[in-house]
Each structure stands twice: as structure tokens, then as C-alpha cells.
Amino acid sequence: MQQSTIGAVYSNFLGQAPDWYKKSIIAFLIFNPILFMADPYIAGWALVLEFIFTLAMALKCYPLQPGGLLLIEALFIGMTSPEHMKHEIVVNIEVVLLLVFMVAGIYFMKDMLLFMFTKLLLKLKNKIALSMSFVAASAFLSAFLDALTVVAVIIAVGMGFYSIYHKVASGKEFHSDHDHTSDDHVDHPKRQDLEDFRAFLRNLMMHAAVGTALGGVMTMVGEPQNLIIADKASWNFGEFFVRMSPVTIPVFFAGIATTFALEKFKIFSYGAQLPQVVRDILTAHSHQQEATRTKQDSAKLWIQGFIGIWLVIGLAGHFAAVGLIGLSIIVLATSMNGIIDEHSIGKAFEEALPFTALLCVFFGVVAVIIDQGLFTPVIDWVLTFEGRSQLVMFYLANGALSMVSDNVFVGSVYITEVAAALEHGHITRDEFDMLAVAINTGTNLPSVATPNGQAAFLFLLTSAIAPLLRLSYGTMVYMALPYTIVLTIVGLAATYFGLGDLTNWLYDMHLIEHHSATLGAEAAAH
């Protein structure tokens, strides 16, 4: 029977997504304008929850299309304006530049990264030690680099491991071309090894992702909102680290202890071992690479290593915006390694650009949150508290809202409100500094609960490796749960019991100094 035009359009709509999913998105699109006319505040929250739903269903359909449709409608009916959406993108231009250039830059360093991490994986046969080293390494790197950059590195490494084994399991040689997205050529006896390897890589990906949160909270370059908070408070790199340390140091060790416990007791889907057959294949690949490595190949690895050193120095020294350093890496890596045709360069951008577009849609949703005042009641309520209870409430409120929204937005909204309170004389400068610590730790730590809380987690969820490892939204939430509980509680306890006393001790030791009452023109105007 010939399909009608409407039927054909419906079939094309969102492609291979399940029928119930298509109908849900259509229902949202019909329902939202009606709800907006009745109650804009509730309609705003409905849009936020619908957007989270599209993220949760990322393995069914990439969130850019359904999320983008919902946002376009929101713009048309007046929930926010294109001008405000553009403003949010401009405010976060460093994150956009980072995604466009830094992730592509990492692509051109993947040979060196795979070489290093293969050595680590094959040398460290103890899974607990390997997991703890992944958490510690990603935490250390995230303290100096951006968390998104570190996750891009981990994804590149994971993809490398996965494609090597998948190629051999499908009956191909190491040097053969292969589509690692299809399991059709994997023999049934090897399927279980493949599933075990997926579980093993899922473990490492989640440990590394949490590591970025543990390290990212410590320094002003670790997360984008840290830069905003440091700018408002006029803190430099060293002062930011010292002021955060009463909370971040106990949390870091609690995070490492959690990794040990999860791997030791094999709970929350952790404890998956690297199958021996996979280890043998990775070892054979490593030996083959070493046997066939030419002087030219060795030179490429050395050059990528030197570029990696420039990456760390450039970011730690704040020589330029993260994205611009990423652009320098693209130029250096491609020119020194002889990659000069447009097609080869274009491949590097395939991974990050869909996510960049999705993040811009997300900034549109943030504009709706601001214009409809969705978080205002929570902010006003938290500002009614005083003393230690206010610190705790700021920490919890930031954490709760960061699980729903983006922690960059939540952190910047709260620090702006607190800066305004200081300008109007409602709080002292010392209280402002303490609240800034509570805001920073609150946005960074509990937000590991959901992929929409941390941009690095969202990047992992929507990356090419997530469907290969069967890493869904629900899986990420479940595997992050023990970390969420431990990091939130330890951070909360450190904020309530230790932050005030330890900050006073830091003043007494002259490791930090009291600031003047005013924030300066930039903070006040912001």
C-alpha cells in the first residue's frame, strides 16, 4: 500500500527513533504553548524537564534534534529571546571554543596518548590500582587543564582500545579497515569477552569522569564556573586552591577511597576485569606497533609528546583561552606530522561539533531558566539563612540545581546574587569569600549525579564511545550514585564543620589575606 505524504513525513521525523519517542516530542510541542499561556513558570519547568528527558534518551536519538525543536518553539512563543540565547553563548564562548578546537587538537595527539595509556594498562594488572590511577591522573590533569579536555583524552584512549580489540574479534588484521560500530562479524564465543571488555571500559570511563570533578573543583581553571567565581572574588590561581582546600582535599581522598571500595567489593557495576584474551590482543598490538615503528613514526610520537607538554604549560599558565591553545595544538600537530589535506583535518572535528551545537541549545534553555525566573524562589529562600547554616544551604541548593541545570549557569547565578548582597551591605567580605567556596564546591561535587550537571559528563554521554560501551544516561546515573553520595556528604561535612575554622587558621598563618570590602568595578557591574 502506498504511503501517504503525511505518513512519509512522520516516518522521516526523527528517523529511526522509537514511535513512542516521536509521539512524546510531538506531544511536548503541542502542549508547551498551551501551558505557557496558562502559567509561564510551570511551562519553563516543563521545558527543562523535557530537555532532560531528551538527554536521558540520548542512545535512542541524539538530543540536538528533539531538544533543538523544543527550544525553537520556546523562542517563537516568547519563553526567551534569540538575543538572550546569543548572550548566553557569548558569555560561555570559552567553552564553545574549547569544544571546537581543543577536542580536535586531542584527536591529533591520540597516537601518543594511546601509546602511553597502553603501557599503563598492560603494566598495571591490578584493576584496583589501575582504577585509582585513572581517578588520580584525571583529577590531577583536571586541576590544570579543563575537565572537558581530560574527558576528550580519555574518550580518545578508550576508542583506541575498543577498536583494536573489536577489529581482531571480528576476524580482521590490526592494519585492516573496520567498522567497530557493528558486532555482526564478532563470533558468538567472543561475544562474552566483548561484553566483559565493554564493562571494563565503562568502569574506567566513569572513574576518570569522576576524577575530573575531584580535580576540577580544586583550581580556578578546572571548570568554567570556577573562572567566573575567581574573577568575582579577585582570587588568583594559588589563593583559589588554598581557599578551596578545607573542602576539596578531604573530598579528594574520600573519592579515592570510594574508588577502592567499589572495585574491591564489585558493587554498582564496578569490578569488571580485563579479559585475558583482550589483554593478549592489546599486548600483541603493542609489540607489533613497536616492531614496525619507523624513525618517522617515533618522531611523530616525540612531537606529540612535546605538544602535550606545551598543552599543560599553556593551560596552567593561562597564556590564552583554552580553545585558542587547542587551535595552536591543531596547527602544531598537523604541520609537524604532515597532515595537510582538508579531509584528514575535518575528521578531527566530527566528534565535537554535534556536541557544540547541543551545548548552544542548552544555553538557550539556560536563557529560558533566567527569563522565567525558575531558580529565583530557591535563591531567595537560601539568602534568608545566616552563618554556618547559610553555607550549608548554599552548598545543597547549588548541588541540587546543578543536577538539573548546568553547573556553569548555577555557579554564575549564585555568585552574582552573593556579589549583589555584598554590594548592598547585606553580608561582609569575609562572608562573601566563604559563600564563594560553598558555591564552587556545591556546583562541582553533587553535580556528578547526572550527566546534565557536568559538561564533561554530558560530553561523555553524547560521544561516539557511549553507544559502543552501552553507556546510557541511566547507567551513568547508577554508576555515579556512590560517588554522588560520598562526595556530597563529605563536602557537606567539611563545609559545616571545617570551612570556618580552617579558613580562620589560613588567615592566621597568612596563607591567605582578608580582602577589601568592595569587589571592584567589574564584579559590581556584572
Curated annotation (Swiss-Prot):
One function term, GO molecular function aspect: sodium:proton antiporter activity
Presence of keyword Amino-acid biosynthesis: no
Transmembrane segments: 25-45, 52-72, 89-109, 139-159, 204-224, 240-260, 305-325, 355-375, 391-411, 448-468, 479-499
Alphabetical UniProt keywords: Antiport, Cell inner membrane, Cell membrane, Ion transport, Membrane, Sodium, Sodium transport, Transmembrane, Transmembrane helix, Transport
Keyword Transmembrane: yes
Membrane-protein topology: Multi-pass membrane protein
Catalytic activity: 2 Na(+)(in) + 3 H(+)(out) = 2 Na(+)(out) + 3 H(+)(in)
Cellular location(s): Cell inner membrane
Any single GO CC term annotated in Swiss-Prot or TrEMBL for this entry: plasma membrane
InterPro entries: Na+/H+_antiporter_NhaB (IPR004671)
Family, similarity comment: Belongs to the NhaB Na(+)/H(+) (TC 2.A.34) antiporter family.
Function: Na(+)/H(+) antiporter that extrudes sodium in exchange for external protons.
Annotated protein name in UniProt: Na(+)/H(+) antiporter NhaB
Protein encoded by which gene: nhaB
